[in-house]
Regions:
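Metal- and O2-centered redox machinery and metal/ROS homeostasis
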Residues: 1-148
Length: 148
């Protein structure tokens, strides 16, 4: 889906034109580092992105729709989850699966620490994109999905 959006915004040469930002490179570096050294911590990144995109991402989709006003069906595929019919039920089941994983206290604490770091990396990307407005939106949606 992301490649369709990039193709819409940048055209057929999107791979040459769309270069990752410093924040994106930092995030990718961390994901690769975790994958190599502590792969179970990838769960924290998956949780942060997937739950975030399913929850606050839908809010951001509406904001992007209004701000960018792309033609219907263009430029916002990133926020579509066609295989998930009921996002609330899916999130509940996903959290139940995570709660059922057999991690010791040290691993649980490491996952929480990594999820918080993943959140900060996401905020760094938002800062690059939109400055303080992006950071505020990200905080609102993070607090919404975590119940804080």
């Amino acid at each position: 889906f992301l490649s369709r959006d990039l193709r819409y915004y940048y055209g057929p040469m999107w791979r040459e034109l769309a270069k990752p930002s410093e924040a994106c490179n930092t995030y990718c570096y961390r994901i690769n580092e975790v994958a190599e050294n502590d792969p179970y911590l990838l769960i924290a990144h998956h949780y942060t992105r997937y739950i975030g995109d399913l929850s606050g991402g839908q809010i951001l989709k509406g904001i992007a729709q209004k701000a960018l006003n792309p033609p219907v069906g263009e430029g916002l595929h990133f926020y579509d989850f066609p295989r998930i019919e009921d996002s609330k039920a899916w999130k509940t089941e996903y959290r139940a699966v995570l709660d059922g994983l057999n991690f010791d206290e040290q691993q649980k604490n490491a996952l929480i620490t990594e999820a918080n770091y993943a959140f900060r990396l996401n905020m760094y990307m938002f800062d690059e994109i939109q400055g303080d407005a992006g950071k505020s939106l990200w905080k609102i949606f993070w607090n919404t999905i975590t119940g804080k």
